[in-house]
From Swiss-Prot:
This is Serine--tRNA ligase. It comes from Magnetococcus marinus (strain ATCC BAA-1437 / JCM 17883 / MC-1). One of its GO terms (biological process) is selenocysteine biosynthetic process. Its main location: cytoplasm. The gene is serS. The keyword Cell membrane does not apply.
Length: 430
């Protein structure tokens, strides 16, 4: 949520910044409501002052045993009018808040302008054969898609997933299930052992307050799964419960920075994705992801974004998977982000890069919604923290990338070296 003081004092600048996102942002309704609020607030304050003065004078007359009936008549007129205006003021404040919570974050000055994916800017790429700046290696034979490989090896069963649950669900079998678990454990060990993250195992059910805090509600409710009889939602990402661990808290400066990682199931309705990625694991209603969350001091958050993005990239380097990193343009960023890097892994079967991680700095946007603060000194004034999050990385998409990049001409798949200790020493699948 944006700072209302900033919107009030820099309305034109905020409007211009939000228009960089490509939408038609018009803060005229905010301006009108604020103007009406100020007018009513002035009258409320005048009536409150009048009421206080009358109360004092009535008390004085009573003490002097003098008639105060005229003052009581005035008080009877002031009271109802004041109550009426206070009710109108509360309604206007609610309308202003509704406008503010619907506004996305403003893009950072370093974010390139643009309307969509085509305007994102590549900042680097890597491949195991070419290193930094290297292009993906050529397999030397016609690459298959991961669903062909997985079905042929008997490790991915899409028909069983559809029978058990419906479309966009998959059953992982045997070595496929073990490979998925191996990937997640490798990521967790890397992040906790080398990158300094604390492992968290959060609930996969959450409440509306937490989803509001991280920005999924109220705008994106249609993409969430909700329990029928209770006010619980299935988490769309571990970002929600993990970031909300600091909700309504005032942290001590010594507690920062906080780095947390979690491996969870994630659940998304994928509203608006009809016809997209209908085959395979790329777009599922249920999927596994290792999430990275950092809670930082404001002045550190952009350096932290580079760090967090590097941690996600390191997962792919360890797996020997070619990737590129792009900075999202202003029109392609998520609702709460001020700056985002997408990491896209190379998929030979599709002949293109696909997103496997999205790493964002939300600055104080989520913190303001969550009331998450810290003190620099023991008795210092609380300040909002900055929150960052990113996939470290999506487990299912990592499995897709392993199957497609490590496939052999005979249909077998080589197990990446870093995964072999998690696979009982298995070197090849098939």
């Amino acid at each position: 949520m944006l700072d209302i003081k900033r919107i009030r004092t820099e309305t034109d600048a905020v409007e211009a910044a939000l228009q960089r996102r490509g939408g038609a942002v018009d803060l005229n309704a905010f301006r009108a409501l604020e103007g009406r609020k100020r007018t009513i607030q002035t009258e409320v304050e005048q009536l409150q002052s009048q009421r206080n003065t009358l109360s004092k004078e009535i008390g004085q007359r009573k003490a002097a045993r003098e008639d105060a009936s005229d003052l009581f008549e005035q008080m009877q007129r002031v009271g109802p009018r004041l109550k009426e205006l206070e009710s109108v003021l509360a309604e206007l404040e609610g309308q202003v808040e509704a406008i503010i919570v619907a506004l996305p974050n403003t893009p950072h000055s370093s974010v390139p302008d643009g309307l969509g994916e085509q305007d994102n800017v590549e900042v680097r790429r890597w491949s195991p054969s070419g290193g930094e700046g290297g292009d993906p290696q050529v397999l030397g034979f016609e690459a298959k898609n991961h669903w062909e490989i997985g079905e042929a090896l008997g490790i991915l069963d899409f028909e069983a997933g559809a029978a058990v649950a419906g479309s966009r669900f998959t059953v992982f079998k045997g070595v496929g299930a073990r490979l998925s678990r191996a990937l997640a454990n490798y990521m967790l060990d890397l992040h906790t052992g080398s990158h300094g993250y604390q492992e968290i195992l959060p609930p996969v059910l959450t409440n509306a307050e937490c989803l509001f805090g991280t920005g999924q509600l109220p705008k994106f409710e249609e993409d969430l799964f909700r329990t029928r009889d209770d006010a619980y939602y299935m988490i769309p990402t571990a970002e929600v419960p993990v970031t909300n661990l600091v909700r309504e808290q005032i942290l001590e400066d010594s507690q920062l920075p906080m780095r947390m990682t979690a491996w969870t199931n994630c659940f998304r309705r994928e509203a608006g994705s009809a016809g997209k990625d209908t085959r395979g694991l790329i777009r599922q209603h249920q999927f596994d992801k290792v999430e990275l969350v950092q809670i930082r001091r404001p002045e550190e958050s952009y350096a932290a974004l580079e760090e967090l993005t590097g941690h996600a990239e390191q997962v792919l380097k360890g797996l020997g998977l070619p990737f590129r990193t792009v900075v999202l343009c202003s029109g392609d960023m998520g609702f709460g982000a001020s700056k985002t890097y997408d990491i896209e892994v190379w998929l030979p079967g599709q002949g293109k890069y696909r997103e496997i991680s999205s790493c964002s700095n939300t600055e104080d946007f989520q913190a303001r919604r969550m009331k998450a603060r810290f003190r620099r000194e023991a008795k210092g004034k609380p300040e909002l923290v900055h929150t960052l999050n990113g996939s470290g990385v999506a487990v299912g998409r990592a499995l897709v990338a392993v199957l497609e990049n490590y496939q052999q001409a005979d249909g077998r798949v080589v197990v990446p070296e870093v995964l072999r200790p998690y696979m009982g020493g298995l070197e090849i699948i098939g």
